[in-house]
Amino acid sequence: MKFHTVYVGKNTKIDLDFALQAQTNNFSSLEELRESFTNSGQTLSTQLFWKPVIDKLITDEGNDLTTIARTAIGENLFDLKVNLTDSVIDGTVLTKARKSFEERILNPFIEQRKEAKRIHDEEQARLERERKQLEEELKGKEKKVQELIREKTRFLSSFNNVKSFKDYWKGKGKNVEIKSQLIEVLKLAFKTDRNRTFIFLTDAFRNAVDWYYNAKKDDQDSKKKAFGDVGIELPKLGVDGIFIPNWLRWELKHRANLKLNLQSVTTKDIHNDINGWGVPKQIFWNEAKNGIEFRQTYPFKYAFQIRMKYTGDYGLKGIYWTLANWGLGGIPPEWKGEMELVLNVDGQLADWITSKKDYPGTLFQFRDDKLLFTLHITQWINVQDQRFKGLLKKQQLDVLEPWGGDIKVPVVDLASYLHFLILADKS
């Protein structure tokens, strides 16, 4: 039985289509069916259960809340005693069912959505107030042109290095060594100058990798505060830092006893090599949608390279060594030498990657105290041993791009890299 109604509140109008499905108890025998009926005088009645089904729930602003409403209702049932003498279902029953549906499901749901919208609007208003406050400061208290220029110069100069960034925002009453305040600062800076903030963050990404493994490698306190107990997200050390299928990682650790000893880590800006000379670093922000689309391709223009050199060895254990030594499977039974892992990090997220079902989304998104950022990686593994090199090529691991499945597209907290630089900088 289908219904259509329009609910008009103080600030909201909701267009609702729903149906009520009636059902009885399941009966295993004719005797149970008879017992479900009640005969009182001339009145024969029975117990029916009603299930509301939402067909459409749309606000006057065009927000389609149908799926959310269905989830909220779930498998709720309403039970009513029905007078079968008058009719299988009469207007009174319908009125009661409709009233029960409104009181138990619809009205609480409307209130929840109103409260969620209120919280969202308050947060947006707060950010807008802070953004406007920054704009007013940039314009200057006396609204003089020279003061506006000087303030804008100070803002842009804050991106020169980590110390300048800390000092500038300290003057604005923000302590960027606290992660939550750093996130607020980045939101404000991004609203003011998106590309300059993006460039600063991606450069910080590259520099943080260098500091983590070189200049500040012994600063365990800053490492833990920025990245937690698990350490830097990318690149990790050893076999855990190589993009390979999980089954192969397990084999290398447990059956091959692979050991890699880090010798050096270097980073290099390769933006011009990847994106072309004269092409600026930038983020392609959709102004109309105030963000980046979930499967947006080639969303960022930047690129840098991480080069990690190892010495290492492995030796297959037990029967696996014997089989390999006999030449089965094409796996060298042992190896010792140098290995170079090269990672190109950039924004070349092509359609063949973004169209995968398990693609995490093209993210440059503030979420809680994180700035989630989707990476495109091209990985090279170089070894001198021809047998080992042949194995890598056979497994298509000498050159690899994580695209999904067992080798997932990486997403990092971009803000954590800048946070590490800020904490580790003692100047």
From Swiss-Prot:
Gene source species: Mycoplasma pneumoniae (strain ATCC 29342 / M129 / Subtype 1)
Domain of life: Bacteria
Family: Belongs to the MG032/MG096/MG288 family.
Any one Pfam family match given in the protein's UniProt record, by short name: DUF240
InterPro entries for this protein: DUF237, DUF240
Name of protein: Uncharacterized protein MPN_509
